[in-house]
């Protein structure tokens, strides 16, 4: 639903602060725990949720998110169950935008039309499919947009002036700027380079620009949020889940609370980010 995403960014703009966009892996380490995590995210200060779709060959993900996907798959998580996770979340939260993030193969096997219909029914607002370039927009991007689901594109430091308009052409919701080349979980990039990149992208689009890769702490979120419309945190949250588990990968009584504590800290960073921008 494009309206929910647009409304959230409009609210944040009025507040003068960037969005905190939080990623977690659906089904990690099990369905009930991940639903608990999902419900805890907005309560702890998350503005937009990225719901990871586990996949057996996640080529763009670092070790932490790969392991999270493996735990979820081992626990029986499927794309259908990930959609159900969103639907269960929507029973108590109709305001927080949900973006499903992952790879095309599970969607293709599920069936594009069925997936989009089920995603709408589950209350999904957007998609990030990392292995579908603009040249393949007819596969999923265009059908999603026609049904009212945002299709969010990734831009990187190597997305030059010639490539950028093509990347942005059918993008909606927001632009996800991957602040460095490589896999997820990398170190924090140079804030001045991030600021310049965000400014460059904004010369080509009116969409919000959210920055991810490398953000792990409240201070990181504060610094990056000083120039971006949103700060995306994924690996730090997935690591927080992992460190709370038992030696055999099972959830503990502290798993959900551990994630909530981290997100509350990150939220203090984004909520003070505009103070940095104004100084």
Swiss-Prot record:
Reaction catalyzed: (1S,2R)-1-C-(indol-3-yl)glycerol 3-phosphate + L-serine = D-glyceraldehyde 3-phosphate + L-tryptophan + H2O
Protein name per UniProt: Tryptophan synthase alpha chain
GO molecular function: tryptophan synthase activity
Quaternary structure and interacting proteins, as annotated: Tetramer of two alpha and two beta chains.
Gene: trpA
Taxonomic source organism: Rhizobium leguminosarum bv. trifolii (strain WSM2304)
InterPro entries: Aldolase_TIM, RibuloseP-bd_barrel, Trp_synthase_alpha_AS, Trp_synthase_suA
Active site annotation, chain numbering: 50, 61
Pathway participation: Amino-acid biosynthesis; L-tryptophan biosynthesis; L-tryptophan from chorismate: step 5/5
GO cellular component: cytosol
């Amino acid at each position: 639903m494009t309206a929910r995403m647009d409304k959230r960014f409009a609210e944040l703009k009025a507040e003068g602060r960037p969005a905190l966009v939080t990623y977690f892996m659906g089904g990690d380490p099990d369905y009930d725990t991940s639903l608990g995590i999902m419900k805890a995210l907005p309560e702890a200060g998350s503005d937009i949720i990225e719901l990871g779709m586990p996949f057996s060959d996640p080529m763009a993900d670092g070790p932490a998110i790969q392991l999270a996907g493996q735990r979820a798959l081992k626990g029986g998580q499927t794309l259908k169950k990930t959609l159900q996770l969103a639907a269960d979340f929507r029973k108590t939260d109709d305001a927080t935008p949900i973006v499903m993030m992952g790879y095309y193969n599970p969607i293709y096997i599920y069936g594009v039309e069925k997936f989009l219909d089920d995603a709408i029914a589950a209350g999904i607002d957007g998609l990030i499919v990392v292995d579908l370039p603009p040249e393949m927009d007819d596969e999923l991007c265009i059908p999603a947009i026609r049904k009212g689901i945002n299709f969010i594109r990734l831009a990187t430091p190597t997305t030059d002036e010639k490539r950028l308009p093509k990347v942005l052409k059918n993008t909606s919701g927001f632009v996800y700027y991957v602040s460095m080349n490589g896999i997820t979980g990398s170190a924090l990039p140079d804030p001045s380079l991030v600021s310049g990149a965000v400014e460059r992208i904004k010369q080509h689009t009116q969409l919000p620009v959210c920055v991810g890769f490398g953000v792990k702490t409240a201070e990181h979120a504060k610094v990056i949020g000083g120039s971006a419309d949103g700060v995306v945190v994924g690996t730090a949250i997935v690591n927080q889940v992992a460190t709370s588990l038992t030696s055999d990968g099972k959830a503990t009584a502290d798993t959900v609370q551990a994630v909530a504590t981290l997100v509350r800290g990150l939220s203090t960073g984004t909520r003070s980010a505009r103070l940095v921008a104004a100084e």
